[in-house]
Amino acid sequence: MAGHSQFKNIMYRKGAQDKKRSKLFAKLAKEITVAAKMGLPDPEYNPRLRAAIQAARVENMPKDNIERAIKKSSDQGGENYEEVRYEGFGPGGIGVIVETLTDNRNRTAGEVRSIFTKNGGNLGETGAVSFMFDRLGLIEYPADAASADDMIEAAIEAGADDCQSGEAGHELYCAPDALHEVAQGLESKFGEARAARIVWKPQNTIALEDEKAETVLKMLEALDDNDDVQQVYANFEMSDSLMEKMSA
């Protein structure tokens, strides 16, 4: 997924996932709670909750934490989170989409705007950059789950629109409202996916060089580090050699 995947890979290689594990768990728990509150607390009948639990398992979140997050959805008087999307431009003119879960719109808007401004970006209005992305369902499997040929054959049969395979794994795309059905079809053949969620996929990407790439990654890391931010998407790409350098 271009910028989104490259940024996550760099953070993982730098060890940021371990250093911020408690913060990561808090974000995963928040999504589980919101998903359970918006639908049934049973993942079998709640696709969003099922996806949230899958994401938590991938990060080795303890089962007790997951169960507490689900139980919290029924607590009376707890926080009421709302989903708010922010869009803007980062260094080099890249488009950035920030998805948040917040209990205070004013606080979150101020913090997100500050991060954009401090890093040479510009927060825009809703719709400012989303037209440069496609809203799609994404299902991910590790590379050893199947061969590229077997995966694409199963993807077509399950109703996916696109399948991209490489050393990092398999990425299958479908219409957002078909995500649950496609994921179930693939699960019957390859087992539970590594992830199944709705994403923003850039239609085109902007290639970044050394200095600009460093500035962009600094901004994305600051956004990702914010407690209210759940996901960050950007339409950039960088060479493998530059990615290795940024990961050091």
Swiss-Prot record:
GO molecular function: DNA binding
InterPro entries: Integrase-like_N (IPR017856), TACO1_YebC-like_2nd/3rd_dom (IPR048300), TACO1_YebC_N (IPR049083), Transcrip_reg_TACO1-like (IPR002876), Transcrip_reg_TACO1-like_dom3 (IPR026564), YebC-like (IPR029072)
Disulfide bonds: none
Compartments reported by the entry: Cytoplasm
Gene Ontology annotations of biological process type: regulation of DNA-templated transcription
Any one cellular-component term (Gene Ontology): cytosol
Pfam families: TACO1_YebC_N (PF20772), Transcrip_reg (PF01709)
Keywords: Cytoplasm, DNA-binding, Transcription, Transcription regulation
HAMAP family with a match to the protein in the record: Transcrip_reg_TACO1
Family, similarity comment: Belongs to the TACO1 family.
Protein name: Probable transcriptional regulatory protein Plav_2114
Organism of derivation: Parvibaculum lavamentivorans (strain DS-1 / DSM 13023 / NCIMB 13966)
